[in-house]
Amino acid sequence: MNGRHVGLAVIVAAVWGVNFVAIDGGLSHYPPLLFTALRFLVAAVPAVFLVGRPGVPWRYVLAGGLVLGALQFGLLFEGMKAGMPPGLSSLVQQGQAVFTAVFAAALLRERIGRRRLAGLAVAVAGMAVAALDQASRGGSAPLGAFALVVGAAAAFGFSNIITRRAAPPDALRWMVWVSAVPPLPLALLSVLTEGPRADLEALTTFSPGAVGSLLYVAWGATLLGFGLWGRLLRSHDASVVAPFSLLVPVFGMSSAWLLRGEALTWLSGAAAVLVISGIAIASLRRAPAATAAAPGWRADADADGRAGRDGGGPARRPLPPYAAGAAGSPVRPS
């Protein structure tokens, strides 16, 4: 990877890390479910009319939109609104790699090797330390908020499996279409649970900071982030690109400290070291043998069982970042 692409990968990680601070800012104005609905609405329109069809069966678009959009981000926004700090949230969301491995083993019959299992155990220990850190901040509400964000990480992991089964050919187009699914059900759920008066007040009261947060999470983290990430995956193997996502909680925690005054305790620092190093152990692999398909590429076999360009089958095409994540690389942002 050349210097320019390294810079782009770091920029994407920074955009996704700071996204948690933007979410925290938007939640000071919008009710969480309404904010989630608006985030996906702004990301989907008008982009959905410009990017072309998703290139996957519609059932996967619907499932991805409901699990990733409504469930994952609904839980994340509710947890942060309930008191989960943005920096710690960015770290706990990396637990999606653990849930992805569990779901892949249970649903796809993937084998978890000893090295990967050890790394995931270290990451789980880091999440336990993060829970202690959240508990030390006081009260039962923060622990409940922590549970919501862990639930969001679990939904992240399940959506990885959906995306892997869908195998969309373009990451940005996939995200735009998935974003078109959650706005309506989330808006209805917001009216029912958060109340029409709170929603109407948030929509009719102008706040430059809230609007800026909304545009950042919709256009910056979703459209710009996935557009650049997909470009990098088209140029490099997923095993080269995916490790840069380990920088997301680094940028998330540091930006929360700088911009929101979130305390960095020794517990949160220990949790960060354990989670990031555990996911790195589980995800970073040795270079494959010369005869093997490169990581991040799917070798589609032809009728004779031959695969890839050299075998006479169809040319390999890069997996999108979510599908690569299902194989164990921590590539999911928020």
Where are these regions (language model features)?
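Hydrophobic/aromatic residues within transmembrane alpha-helices
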Residues: 26, 35, 79, 106-108, ...
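Specific alpha-helical transmembrane segments that line the substrate/conduction pathway
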Residues: 34-45, 77-111, 116, 120, ...
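Membrane-interface helix-cap regions at the ends of transmembrane helices
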Residues: 18-25, 29, 42-57, 124-140, ...
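Membrane-interface capping segments at transmembrane-helix boundaries
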Residues: 234, 283-296
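Specific transmembrane alpha-helical segments of multi-pass solute transporters/efflux pumps
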Residues: 14-20, 48-93, 101-103, 129, ...
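Hydrophobic alpha-helical transmembrane segments of multi-pass integral membrane proteins
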Residues: 4, 31-48, 63, 119-125, ...
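Hydrophobic transmembrane alpha-helices of multi-pass small-molecule transport proteins
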Residues: 41, 47, 103, 112-134, ...
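Glycine-/small-residue-enriched transmembrane alpha-helix faces in small-molecule transporters
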Residues: 1-34, 135-165, 184-188, 293-301, ...
